[in-house]
UniProtKB/Swiss-Prot annotation:
The lineage of its organism: Bacteria, Thermotogati, Deinococcota, Deinococci, Deinococcales. NCBIfam families: PRK00881.1, purH. The IMP cyclohydrolase activity resides in the N-terminal region. This is Bifunctional purine biosynthesis protein PurH. PROSITE patterns: MGS (PS51855). Gene3D superfamilies: 3.40.140.20, Methylglyoxal synthase-like domain (3.40.50.1380). Pathway: Purine metabolism; IMP biosynthesis via de novo pathway; 5-formamido-1-(5-phospho-D-ribosyl)imidazole-4-carboxamide from 5-amino-1-(5-phospho-D-ribosyl)imidazole-4-carboxamide (10-formyl THF route): step 1/1; Purine metabolism; IMP biosynthesis via de novo pathway; IMP from 5-formamido-1-(5-phospho-D-ribosyl)imidazole-4-carboxamide: step 1/1. The gene is purH.
Length: 514
């Protein structure tokens, strides 16, 4: 009996070679639309599905394969009763279904209109895939070009058939999830989140383990989103670890926020961010990558050891060589010159040197795991220009203090709460992050700064419940303070700042980070 294969694919990778090999082995091919045209153009004989169903494609191609002559041939079990019914109705078996779906994700990712997105919702394809996967004991279902070779085995094991069926159902499940997520968010104004949210995750990288050696780990992509770190190119060094991904993502996010804020016009200033355990430990803005790196390193030479560094401009040989004496895990940049890559490969072969995907932008959702669920929020992407800073003290900040306050505000946004940052001349001089009380965060930042606190500014991501931070800052030599305001004791805090001659600014915007 002649075996029949139904082929209808949007991703035509390898399809001509696959179809030709099937024909050479005596298979009869059925096909539709663009796939049929491509096969015939390549000189590969194929029968139109409409010739099998006796019914033409209708509704601009919306209905092609939804017919008993197709689904009966796919769903029939290879047993007497079903075969008799097929014979009674003049239908033939279909032994292989090779289908992948309309490119819905790609369509919406490129900014298609709602109407275009709707037209790229595949109906017949998922129906055929699900039918073949259900009847995988008798029908080979192929949704991935990497699996085409299995069709040429003398006998495909039930284990492989079951694996292919699982992949097929995962394919349609992911597809439906992408559509559901798109439709749920299509009318969202951004103020609320959908009632139902499907996370469409695909593993894209294996790592040796998670945060710790006893924890398995992997890296996943959410839907069709691209990420600057997720899709970065590794130019040199060891494979990325779980913690490397997390730290590089944190470092790059802060570097880009500061670059957008400080680098005006673009290309005139360089930002360097050093991160340890997702917290910034040294940040600087300077006229070159080398200068920015050296100032960020010197901000906390102890903590930067074993850190992850992100820079906002390409790394040249001079910048690379200036990193000679510091052990780093990862360096991520918008580009790295060939000379710098060669130097890193020779002198720092373990350092992971990444070029970020600068065209990629993170999605709007921030998803945190909970036992039994997730906490979901919009990402905190509020820019400085969205604030309405209010000077609440007698003395306003100087021009230099305003620049440093804005810089420190961006850094403290990216530190774990409770967080306090001291900065001077575009460089962090003291950071206190992850503290369980605000005064402890301030004490850590002041201790970290030492004498460098004199003439520095201080930024906090949340309000001061008491005036203790202001008094500590003044004693250390800090001259200006920025915080959201909104505490019950704001009048006491303002009075203390005035008493001590500090300038203080309220932003009205809190930036907790957990």
């Amino acid at each position: 009996m002649t075996r029949r294969a139904l082929i209808s694919v949007s991703d035509k990778t390898g399809i001509e070679a696959f179809a030709r090999a099937l024909v050479e082995r005596g298979w009869e091919l059925l096909s539709t639309g663009g796939t049929l045209a491509a096969l015939r153009a390549a000189g590969i004989p194929a029968t139109a599905v409409s010739d099998v169903t006796g019914f033409p494609e209708i509704l601009d191609g919306r209905v092609k394969t939804l017919h008993p002559a197709i689904h009966g041939g796919i769903l029939a079990r290879r047993e007497e009763g079903h075969l008799a019914q097929l014979a009674e109705h003049g239908l033939d078996l279909i032994d292989l279904v090779c289908v992948n779906l309309y490119p819905f994700r790609e369509t919406v990712a490129r900014g298609a209109t709602f109407e275009e997105a709707i037209e790229n919702i595949d109906i017949g394809g998922p129906a055929m895939i699900r039918a073949a996967a259900k009847n995988h004991a008798g029908v080979l279902v192929l949704v991935d070009p990497a699996d085409y070779g299995l069709a040429f085995q003398d006998e495909v094991s039930q284990t492989d058939r079951r694996r292919l069926a699982a992949k097929a159902f995962r394919h349609t499940s992911d597809y439906d999830a992408a559509i559901s997520t798109y439709l749920a968010g299509a009318d969202e104004a951004g103020e609320t989140l959908p009632e139902h949210l499907t996370l469409d995750l695909s593993r894209i990288a294996a790592v040796r383990y998670g945060e710790n050696p006893h924890q398995p780990g992997a890296i996943y992509r959410l839907g069709t989103e691209r990420g600057p770190v997720l899709d970065a190119r590794l130019l040199s060094g060891k494979p990325m670890s779980f913690n490397n991904y997390a730290d590089a993502d944190a470092a790059w996010a802060l570097a880009q926020e500061l670059a957008a804020q400080e680098d005006q016009p673009p290309g005139t200033r360089a930002v360097c961010v050093a991160v340890k355990h997702a917290n910034p430990c040294g940040v600087a803005v300077a006229d070159s990558v080398q200068a920015a790196w050296e100032q960020a390193r010197d901000a906390d030479t102890l903590s930067v050891f074993g850190g992850v560094v992100a820079v906002s401009r390409p790394v040249d040989l001079a910048a690379a060589q200036s990193m000679r004496g510091t052990f780093l895990e990862v360096l991520i940049a918008p580009d790295v010159t060939p000379e710098a890559v060669a130097w890193f490969a020779a002198k720092k072969p373990d350092l992971r040197v990444l070029v970020a995907d600068t065209a990629a932008h993170p999605g709007t959702l921030d998803v945190r795991p909970l036992a039994g669920g997730f906490a979901v929020q919009r990402r905190d992407t509020r820019p400085w220009d969205d604030l309405c800073p209010e000077v609440v003290t007698v003395r306003p900040p100087t021009e230099q203090e305003w620049g440093d306050l804005r810089f420190a505000w961006a850094v403290v946004k990216h530190a774990r709460s409770n967080a306090v940052v001291l900065a001077k001349n575009g460089v962090t001089v003291g950071l206190g992050a992850g503290a369980v009380s605000r005064i402890w965060a301030a004490e850590r930042a002041v201790q970290n700064a030492g004498e460098r606190a004199r003439g520095a500014v201080l930024a906090s991501e949340a309000f001061f419940p008491f005036d203790d931070v202001v008094r500590l800052a003044a004693e250390a030599g800090v001259t200006a303070v920025l915080q959201p305001g909104g505490a019950k004791r704001d009048p006491e805090v303002i009075a203390a700042a005035n008493e001590l001659g500090l300038s203080m600014v309220f932003t009205g915007s809190r930036h907790f980070r957990h």
